[in-house]
Amino acid sequence: MIQITRYKEIFAPASPSDRTRAFEDYWAYLLTRDGALQEEVQSLEYKTHYYQSLQTRPVRTQQPLTQVQTMAELSDLLATQHSPRADRRLLALTAIYKFASHEAAGIRAAWTATPPWERCQNLTDRITRYHLCEEFCHLRLFAEMFKVCRLQVDWPPLSWLARTAYGTFARFPGWCLDPIAFGSEVMGMMFYRHTWHALEEVFAQEPEVLRRLHELLAEIMVDELGHIGERRSFLGNTGVKVAR
């Protein structure tokens, strides 16, 4: 008889020991999936190898999608056009760019607000630092998505107000930060799921390009799904109620 493993739903009650065990299991999974942390280059061992392998098997659109060279220029161009006939491929790429730009700002703020590896005092500190290196790797994968479409990206600094807001948020106490961070991870996954289907529609005529974009997005989504579980493990009963 087939045994079906039943898992708790994400908002199910979890004791402190349950959450501690979840952190330990997640840490073991991280080391198996991505290898050693490379803090000096804000990367991870196996993700570095994966990114290098992408450079040996490049995929590009058959023709440039636009005359501009960078995502920043494309974003500015579309903002001035307001055309209902705008290329939907460019609109999809710009949505990804704007999302990833805010991700970049938040990651940089969190990187400066968290202790470096040698000063991490416990497992959750190490997981947090590892998590941030994953996010830096995701920025490289986003850049690779744009490169597939013959566009370059240079993550711009946000305004002083936005940088200050992100920096302040990264320094919130855990009881305040954790429910918000959990909700942010869930919303991010919803964005990625929508993006997955949007890419299917707009790049249907270039199957090789679509496969590469999906490959890159899937690499990000697997990590983000793990981040949802990680963030849930930070939440006690009160945090779960706030997150809901």
Predicted regions and their residues:
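Non-heme di-metal
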Residues: 1-244
